[in-house]
């Protein structure tokens, strides 16, 4: 039995479809809460999608804007739910998506770090253990004691990245987050992801337009177009398929 076969499945999509109702305007959307007669159009963001990710794998979701990549990530993280089909996820997820979202602007950087770690299910003891790593990685100095309303958008993103990569995830989801901050900080981010992926028990789901980066971190790729899977296989073959589209 191969190593891949022995490792357990940590993410499974089983014939998953996701549709959104598009209304003419906000007024129509509000009326739809009280009446089923309001007209709308259905937009299918993900179409009958099936795939599995095993523990320790690195998988790249490849596709142009509108391919359904962000919708897939939202369903994995529980932000959104499928219209039909089943999704199975096993493990603590750290998602490098909207890095500066979910912060309390009136609380300090340190307070926000503790709060976001607690939302990830970490105990107080675990939080205090990783807090020095978050502080060192964010490299925000005295600003960590200041309320986030004093932060620039880049500083918030740095803090968000520092929290996510130091929270000891089972599953790491990266969506263009490696473009955070200046050149030196971006190099620091890439190095940190390399360190995380050196742990064969961490699973990576990677969404990027930088295919060379995907090639470095991932073994397999899934090519998507308008919510439909066109190809799944070895990362080199997936990139070649995408380039030929």
For each of these PLM feature ranges, what is it?
Residues 1-45, 238-244:
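Pre-NBD coupling/linker segments of ABC/ABC-like ATPases
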Residues 77:
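Helix-to-loop junction immediately C-terminal to a conserved catalytic motif
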Residues 217-234, 242:
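H-loop (His-switch) and adjacent beta-strand-loop-beta switch element
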Residues 62-64:
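The feature captures the beta-strand-to-loop junction immediately N-terminal to the Walker
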Residues 208-209:
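H-loop/switch region of ABC-family ATPase nucleotide-binding domains
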Residues 31-32, 114, 126-143:
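Conserved ABC ATPase "signature" region
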């Amino acid at each position: 039995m191969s190593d891949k076969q022995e490792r357990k499945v940590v993410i499974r999509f089983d014939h998953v479809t996701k549709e959104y109702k598009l209304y003419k305007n906000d007024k129509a959307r509000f009326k739809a809460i009280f009446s089923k007669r309001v007209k709308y159009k259905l937009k299918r963001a993900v179409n009958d999608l099936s795939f599995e990710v095993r523990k320790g794998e690195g998988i790249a979701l490849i596709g142009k804007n509108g391919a359904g990549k962000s919708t897939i990530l939202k369903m994995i993280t529980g932000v959104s739910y499928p219209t039909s089909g089943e999704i199975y996820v096993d493990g603590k997820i750290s998602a490098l998506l909207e890095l500066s979202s979910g912060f309390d602007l009136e609380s300090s950087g340190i307070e926000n770090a503790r709060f976001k770690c607690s939302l990830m299910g970490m105990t107080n003891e675990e939080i205090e253990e990783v807090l020095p790593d978050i502080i060192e990685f964010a490299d925000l100095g005295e600003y960590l004691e200041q309320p986030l309303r004093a932060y620039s958008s880049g500083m918030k993103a740095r803090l968000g990245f520092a929290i996510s990569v130091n929270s000891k995830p089972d599953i790491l989801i990266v969506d263009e987050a490696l473009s955070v901050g200046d050149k030196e900080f971006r190099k620091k981010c890439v190095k940190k992801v390399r360190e995380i992926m050196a742990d064969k028990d961490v699973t990576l789901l990677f969404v990027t337009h930088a295919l060379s980066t995907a090639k470095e971190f991932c073994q397999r790729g899934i090519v998507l177009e308008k919510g439909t899977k066109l190809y799944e296989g070895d990362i080199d073959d997936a990139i070649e398929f995408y380039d030929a589209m």
